[in-house]
A protein has these predicted regions:
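Receiver (REC) domain active-site loop signature in two-component systems and cognate sites
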Residues: 67
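Two-component/phosphorelay signaling modules centered on CheY-like receiver
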Residues: 22-41
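Active-site beta3 strand of CheY-like receiver
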Residues: 56-62
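Active-site residues of response regulator receiver
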Residues: 64, 96
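Helix N-cap/capping motif at the beta->alpha junctions
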Residues: 42-51, 72
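Short amphipathic alpha-helix used as the core "switch/output" element in two-component signaling
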Residues: 51, 73-87
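Alpha4 helix (beta4-alpha4-beta5 surface) of REC/receiver domains from two-component response regulators
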Residues: 74, 88, 99-114, 127, ...
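CheY-like receiver
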Residues: 6-8, 130-163
Length: 163
């Protein structure tokens, strides 16, 4: 996809970046701005994130896993609770410092649309944003949470993942 086309797609998005580390928020903001993002909001903890969602109505949220007050998983569970929170279908990219399989699985079960390792590359960030905002998977109810429909894997890939 051409850079101008990507810029045009991203410039209309209202993006919320939630991370307790000011440097990571600034780095992510810079990447988003360089990709064409024009409206980037920031929150430094989970409570501030919930308030920003209520007041600013972002199109997508980049959410850190490990934060004080409310961590990323707690925020995600609140956001994905239909009837409890006003935006259960908000696209969420979970940001993680370590790619532990248990954390990735927990994030996806709690309703993360995608995940990225920190620090991430502009290309990976752009690819995830395009994936969840412009090619979203349908949302489904899983227990008490509202989550993206699981991806369908081919039989050979599924067998590899089970091993």
């Amino acid at each position: 996809m051409a850079n101008k086309q990507i810029e045009k797609m991203l410039q209309g998005l209202n993006i919320l970046v939630v991370d307790d580390n000011a440097y990571m928020r600034r780095l992510t903001r810079t990447m988003l701005t360089n990709l064409g993002g024009r409206s980037v909001l920031e929150a430094s903890d989970g409570l501030a994130a919930l308030e920003s969602i209520r007041t600013a109505d972002p199109d997508v949220m980049l959410l850190d896993w490990d934060m004080p007050v409310l961590n990323g998983i707690e925020v995600l569970r609140i956001v994905r609770s239909p009837g409890v929170f006003p935006r259960p279908n908000l696209p969420v990219i979970m940001l993680m410092a370590r790619a532990q399989r248990a954390h990735v699985n927990e994030a996806l079960r709690a309703g993360a649309n995608e995940f990225l390792l920190k620090p991430t590359s502009p290309k990976a960030l752009c690819d995830r944003l395009i994936s969840i905002v412009f090619k979203p998977r349908p949302m489904v109810t899983l227990g008490t949470y509202y989550v993206p429909q699981p991806r369908r894997l081919s039989a050979p890939r599924e067998a590899v993942l089970r091993e």
